[in-house]
Amino acid sequence: MCIRDRVAGAIQENFPKEVEAATSYCVWMSAPLYYGSVRFEANKVTADSLFFQTMGIDVLSGVPEKELMQKDVVFLSDRLARKMFDQENPIGKVISYNKEIELTVKGTYADIPENATVRPDAVISLPTVWSRGWGNYSWRGGDSWIAFIRFRPGADKSVVNARLNDLIKKYRPAEDQKVVGYTAFVKPIRDVYREEPDVKRMRNIMSILGIIILFIATLNYVLISISSLSYRAKAIGVHKCSGAGSGKILGMFLLETAIIILFALLLMGLILLNFRDFIEDTTAVELGALFSLDRLWVPLLTVAILFLIGGALPGRIFARIPVSQVFRRYTEGKKGWKRPLLFVQFAGVAFICGLMYVVMLQYYYVLNKDLGYNPKRVVVANTDFGNKENQDYALTFFRGLPYVESVSSADSHPVYSYSGTMIQDESGQSLFSSRFCEMMEDYPKMMGMVMKEGRMPRNENEVAINETYGEWMHWGTELLNRTVYNSGYVCKVVGVIKDFRIGNFTNPQAPFILMSTKNFGNCVHVRLKEPFAENLQKLNKVSADAFPDKTVDFRSMEQMIKESYNSIRVFSNATILAAVTMFFVMMMGLIGYTTDEVRHRSKEIAIRKVNGAEASGILEMLVKDVLYVAVAAVVIGVAASWYVNDMWMDMFAEHVPVSWAAYVLIAIVNLLVIVACVLWKSWRIANENPVNSLKSE
């Protein structure tokens, strides 16, 4: 079960019959670990002593219930311990967190599988942060803490949910309900991830894509098989005349399908090995985990279904045809099977093309849309320089570098959003949560932010707000000299900053409070001169030399923005891959259909030409035959893509404008490709001497 806030311990204490264990953890300590001078990047959590018991993680060495009650203690995953110490015993080894805190390794635990949402390689004891006064682990705060509880087998979870709000009232002051409000409940850990709106949305869309690709590919194979009946009918007839029964004929087709699928699987294996990085990036999981034994039934079941549909359907059609009709009935074009299959292919390709167009358009839209600040050539690094003297030295050092254009700092940066604070009215009633950040006076100018009116705050009693804050407060156009009640602080509005993007464009525009600081550090921002990449390397090297006792890693802000849309990029790549795949699948099916139609109707076409029909008329007849199927299919496919695009775009606060004309153009392009393919395959027979066709008859 997963819950938020500091309630885990209280639940365990008050529900001993239902709850077996409970734990709280946070992910603040995200800086690197060091063993000597060697740096290690690893996922870390700061947790209490019942973390392993609650989460059901196997402890390989050490006693976490005892050791994690001490400060400056760490437990390492078996993977990280081997990476750090090779075959040496890790117990008792001392490592460093961010070159600031020495941590003693007191135990190891089993590696956590990739499919876990909580997958730390290091668990640091909770007293490590308590002893330094970091965070707010109290009943009046601490919303950055995540808590889990483990129920006893057979426990009634509804008992806990029914009494949970009353339990919280015992610990939280009564005025908190009025000021900030709260709701407490327990929820299965599996549902926490699966029921996130973005996860559900992407799961539905990717499921639709996968089903469409598999379904159309299978139907395409069936279509090609059925299209081949005319020239394979004699062979089947010979087999039947030689005594082969329906089962034998069906078995022949199943064997043929099995051989084709086997070669397809071998080709797939080669593709997986040669494009491993791309595939793992797209699926966000290693191939070993994707095809692990406990999940292997999924691809095996998929292959089995494809085998049954692709082999059994055309096989049964042949097997059930009487010998007396084999040579006669299938010398004519039989479209009853082929047209519906072709319809599905056309609709599927139109759907994926419409989806691909909007996904790519939205991805490049959010990457290039004005953010309200200028991230070009800006790099950021999180570090604390300590006292004022060291801060001044660091500021002077960075400003003195010849390849640095400007320098400033703030508590954080806008790419990953800011911390929040509750805003109240004069009576203390909670209104909403606002983002806030302390910035040096020159920071907005350095970042290209626009101060619409007023000035920067100069002391702790002054703030600047953004436009959205004024809108949420319903203050109209008169924003200066207003009073802000901010979690117990009363401040005067002295400036209004133009809205800028906080987080990425999947987040709605949030209200924002800007406060002043004269301290240099926390999140250092540097705008470099060109050449950017070369100067970034220089900056990181000289920073490491100038501050050897600190971790000073500058990262490109533009790259961070791109990474914040990584899931969108992956989805865009997936839709492109799906569209290209389905385009070629459709082309194979259409070519097979057209070739078969031309073969069947060669005598008809020859007679029409003998009677005076022009080549253009023949081509028009064949094109119309396909368009009867294609037009309706493409319209349905494009309409379906519009619906799914609308569902996908709900995850963004800002949408790229897409008019109906774009969907019409997508439909027209699809139809033009279909017509071009038909003309290409029909051109020879339409311009051929009709005598040749009549001779062959």
Regions found by a protein language model. Give the residues of each.
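N-terminal Sec/SRP start-transfer signal
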Residues: 316-347
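Short, small-residue-biased leader/transition segments that mark boundaries at the very start
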Residues: 1-3
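Intracellular coupling helices
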Residues: 219-260, 320-331, 588-627, 687-696
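Mid-to-C-terminal secondary-structure elements
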Residues: 48-60, 74-198, 396, 400-563
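Hydrophobic alpha-helical transmembrane segments of multi-pass inner-membrane transport and secretion
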Residues: 199-234, 261-262, 266, 337-362, ...
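Small-residue-rich transmembrane alpha-helices
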Residues: 169-170, 257-320, 351, 361, ...
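Membrane-proximal juxtamembrane linkers immediately C-terminal to transmembrane helices
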Residues: 15-19, 58, 118, 290, ...
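Membrane-helix entry/capping segments
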Residues: 165-212, 231, 245-246, 275-298, ...
